[in-house]
């Protein structure tokens, strides 16, 4: 908080009922302009090291010298490579901690593009299927181990959930052999 020159923490909720200790979003925005501020800047995400040589540390990066609208177009362009368009009704499931760079970027990009984001407190294979079914999840970002654990679930467990809403699953962090990418693909 010292870096942003404030001694207050803003806690707010978006939704039907405010949580204890928070203020409803409409109360915070009442009387505020509806147009972007004239001096706005792009900002930058704080990424974290893996912590292999100690505790994870935040890595402060420079602010990109791009207009915020240009940065938004870059976010949109990145996800369009995967067939994900701005404001097209996608629901992104985040099942890993946001301190992982790729997870934070996919989640942040989804929010920038106007998509709904569903956060999991703790990832489990069946928990993921349940959320896909309940929220109509269309995209997610996972590591190959998560794919393996999903495929290791018994068929009767997998069959309980409707996952027809899924349009794009992206993996990173480790190689994923081609024969594991598609369960019906023949082994090489």
Q: Residue locations for each model-derived region?
A:
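Thr-Gly-centered strand-to-loop micro-motif
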Residues: 61, 94-95, 119-120, 170-172
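Adenylate-forming
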Residues: 1, 16-19, 96, 126, ...
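Short beta-strand->loop structural element characteristic of the AMP-binding/adenylate-forming
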Residues: 1, 10, 58-60, 116-122
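A short helix->loop->beta-strand "cap" motif at the edges of active sites that frequently abuts
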Residues: 5-11, 115, 164-167, 188
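Conserved AMP-binding/adenylation subdomain of ANL enzymes
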Residues: 67-91, 99-138, 153
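Conserved G/P- and acidic residue-centered "switch" motifs that form tight phosphate/ATP-binding loops
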Residues: 52, 114, 173
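ANL superfamily adenylate-forming
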Residues: 2-46, 55, 64-77, 153-154
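Conserved S/T- and glycine-rich ATP-binding loop of Class I adenylate-forming
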Residues: 49-52, 92, 98, 132, ...
């Amino acid at each position: 908080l010292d870096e942003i020159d404030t001694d207050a923490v803003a806690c707010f909720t978006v939704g039907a009922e405010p949580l204890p200790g928070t203020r409803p979003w409409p109360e915070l925005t009442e009387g505020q302009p509806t147009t972007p501020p004239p001096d706005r800047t792009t900002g930058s995400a704080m990424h974290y090291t893996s912590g292999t040589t100690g505790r994870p540390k935040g890595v402060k990066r420079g602010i990109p010298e791009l207009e915020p609208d240009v940065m938004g177009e870059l976010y949109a362009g990145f996800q369009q490579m995967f067939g994900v368009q701005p404001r097209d009704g996608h629901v992104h499931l985040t099942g890993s901690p946001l301190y992982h760079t790729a997870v934070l970027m996919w989640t942040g990009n989804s929010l920038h593009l106007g998509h709904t984001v569903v956060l999991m407190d703790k990832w489990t294979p069946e928990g993921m299927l349940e959320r896909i079914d309940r929220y109509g999840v269309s995209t997610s970002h996972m590591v190959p181990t998560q794919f393996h654990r999903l495929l290791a679930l018994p068929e009767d467990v997998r069959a309980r959930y409707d996952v027809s809403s899924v349009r794009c699953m992206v993996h990173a962090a480790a190689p994923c052999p081609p024969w594991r990418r598609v369960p019906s693909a023949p082994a090489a």
